[in-house]
């Protein structure tokens, strides 16, 4: 077995005069919506609504816009000062035509396997990240996506994250969501390769490729606090960590995407390479 080394990178943020915005997200029937992705517009500040729809988010300007996004509902932008109660309108989906899938599941291949054995974990706050899987004609014989494997590390027994599948749009960016509802995944304690069975969704590998990614859930059930003494001030500092950590490895591909304020931004200025989440797919026939 090859040795896999894990490096930890903790990025600490300095805090200025932030004020906390508290609110709740509900649907048109006044029912709470959990796991809504919430961002401060044009800033790397985000959070997730709790099971009861409540949320807290820090901003130094109440005139800033907050962006709300979740599968199955229309996206919405609201002033921070007016976000005590945010109502999202559900999207009415037409009934899908019943399709019979003639799956055999007698053959499997794994794609996206990483060769670099040095994995890194970054705890840098709210995060949506993706990995691109290009199409190959040989996948035609194993076109169904059966499983997702994602390398994780957690200090909590039942941490959760959200998985996403995106089509490729006309500009090569992550486009429409391929699932019609959230896929919340439970991650067990420890460092491991977590397998997620997605065969019930009948996902077929698109001819333009597919983006597969995760969304970190900044909720209380995923939070672990630890205290330490600041050597400069001799004061006790409390650090909040949100699990699970998704592991990354370094790749030569310099083109990547960053999710900011509800949209994907292309990054291709790092010619040396970049870090990519360790995700692979199991395809079957």
Regions found by a protein language model. Give the residues of each.
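Short, acidic Ser/Thr/Gly-rich low-complexity loop/linker segments typical of extracellular
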Residues: 44-54
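Short amphipathic beta-strand segments in non-cytosolic proteins
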Residues: 36-46, 71-73, 102
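Bacterial Sec-dependent N-terminal signal peptides
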Residues: 1-24, 285
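A short, amphipathic beta-strand motif
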Residues: 21-27, 53, 86
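Beta-sheet-rich sandwich/jelly-roll-like modules and their strand-loop junctions
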Residues: 94-168, 216, 220-285
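Aromatic- and Gly/Pro-enriched, solvent-exposed loop/edge beta-strand patches characteristic
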Residues: 160-233
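Short, ordered, surface-exposed loop/turn motifs in non-cytosolic proteins
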Residues: 21, 27-42
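A short, solvent-exposed loop/turn motif at the edges and junctions
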Residues: 67-79
């Amino acid at each position: 077995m090859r040795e896999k080394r894990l490096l930890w990178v903790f990025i600490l943020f300095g805090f200025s005069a932030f004020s906390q915005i508290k609110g709740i997200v509900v649907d048109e029937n006044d029912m709470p919506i959990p796991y809504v992705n919430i961002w401060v517009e044009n800033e790397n500040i985000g959070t997730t609504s709790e099971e009861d729809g409540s949320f807290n988010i820090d901003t130094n300007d109440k005139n800033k816009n907050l962006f709300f996004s979740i599968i199955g509902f229309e996206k919405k932008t609201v002033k921070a000062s007016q976000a005590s109660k945010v109502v999202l309108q559900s999207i009415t989906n037409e009934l899908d035509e019943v399709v019979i899938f003639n799956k055999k599941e007698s053959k499997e291949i794994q794609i996206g396997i990483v060769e670099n054995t040095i994995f890194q974990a970054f705890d840098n706050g709210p995060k949506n990240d993706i990995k691109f899987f290009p199409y190959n004609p040989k996948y035609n014989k194993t076109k169904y996506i059966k499983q997702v494997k994602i390398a994780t590390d957690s200090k909590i027994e039942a941490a959760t994250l959200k998985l996403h599948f995106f089509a490729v749009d006309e500009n090569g960016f992550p486009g429409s969501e391929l699932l019609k509802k959230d896929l919340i995944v439970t991650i067990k304690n420890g460092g491991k390769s977590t397998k997620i069975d997605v065969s019930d969704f009948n996902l077929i590998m698109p001819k333009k490729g597919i983006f597969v990614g995760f969304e970190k859930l900044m909720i209380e059930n995923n939070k672990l606090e630890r205290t330490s003494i600041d050597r400069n001030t001799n004061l006790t500092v409390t650090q909040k960590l949100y699990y699970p950590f998704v592991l990354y490895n370094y790749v030569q591909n310099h083109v990547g995407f960053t999710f900011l304020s509800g949209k994907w931004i292309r990054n291709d200025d790092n010619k040396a390479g970049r870090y990519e989440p360790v995700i692979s797919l199991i395809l079957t026939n």
